[in-house]
Amino acid sequence: MSILEDVLEEEYARSIRLCRHMERELNSLPKGSIRTRKINSHKYYYLNYRDGDKVRSDYLHADEVEVIRAKINRRHELVAALKEQQRSQKQIEKALGRVPNVE
């Protein structure tokens, strides 16, 4: 096996580990988006997300809004990074001409 193949297999294994870590973190983060409703000059915040075919709205206390917003932003970043890692894995598979054996 050549040095280049060894390096590509190591990178593939690293990418697999990174994807698993990102997927675990994604499972702990909230899905959806924050919506604001103004009723009688008061603002109410809701976390909107899908639960099967239904759209659910859960009330958020004003203190929770920024924390949840940061978690949702982190989720978007992780989804983009996960897609990039999956693209990288496909490129490595094409370069090697096979799927590397990862333990």
Where are the model-predicted features located?
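Conserved glycine(s) in the ABC-transporter nucleotide-binding domain "signature"
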Residues: 1-103
